[in-house]
């Protein structure tokens, strides 16, 4: 990518896993130069712990829609999803009717999959009634890393914690919550930090050199 320099902090050789952006910050390579929507998502959202209910619901929903598709497609429709699902306000989505679902199936700005749209409404209703809450369940399955993954190849598709959380969510009535999509949710909301070694947001990035 123009303006970005691939690096490897451990070997000094070229790597596709970390790049230096135009602002001088080392990032996971998928974030690009850091001056795009993807870069801002990497810097400000992905891997950042949150207890915000709407943020949790949004992350879970985007994971639902990602099933069978690429993340870039879903990511590019984030604003449309926010509009369609009422800012991911849980109570407002839980109150959506069959007529609302029918309307969203015709909305070309989002992914028009009736099953996933209905699952989003059902998941909002589960969030409204379930105990422990989604926030509490996610936190109870937190993964603490002393060292960052050495490369993207080291990132798992799922973990025992993701499998446990998926089972807990299914028991509460959540839908489209398999271990793989749940692990992606955990990465998104900072229950696990999977920024790779050398990225300025990685768990083992030198404290004295950490860039904020």
Where are these regions (language model features)?
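HhH-family (HhH-GPD) DNA N-glycosylase catalytic core used in base-excision repair
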Residues: 4-212
């Amino acid at each position: 990518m123009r303006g970005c320099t691939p690096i490897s902090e451990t070997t000094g050789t070229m790597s596709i896993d970390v790049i230096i952006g135009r602002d001088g910050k080392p990032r996971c390579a998928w974030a690009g130069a850091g001056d795009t929507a993807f870069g801002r998502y990497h810097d400000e959202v992905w891997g950042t712990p949150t207890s915000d209910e709407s943020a949790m619901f949004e992350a879970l929903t985007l994971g639902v829609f990602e099933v069978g598709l690429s993340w870039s497609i879903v990511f590019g429709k984030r604003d449309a999803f926010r509009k369609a699902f009422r800012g991911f306000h849980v109570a407002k989505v839980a109150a959506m009717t069959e007529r609302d679902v029918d309307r969203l199936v015709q909305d070309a700005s989002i992914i028009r999959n009736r099953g996933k749209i209905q699952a989003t409404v059902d998941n909002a209703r589960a969030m409204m009634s379930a105990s422990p809450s989604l926030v509490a369940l996610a936190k109870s399955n937190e993964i603490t890393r002393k060292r960052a993954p050495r490369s993207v190849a080291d990132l798992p598709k799922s973990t025992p914690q993701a499998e446990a959380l998926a089972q807990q969510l299914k028991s509460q009535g959540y839908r489209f919550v398999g271990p793989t999509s749940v692990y992606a949710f955990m990465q998104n909301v900072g229950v696990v930090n999977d920024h790779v070694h050398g990225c300025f947001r990685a768990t083992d990035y030198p404290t004295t050199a950490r860039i904020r």
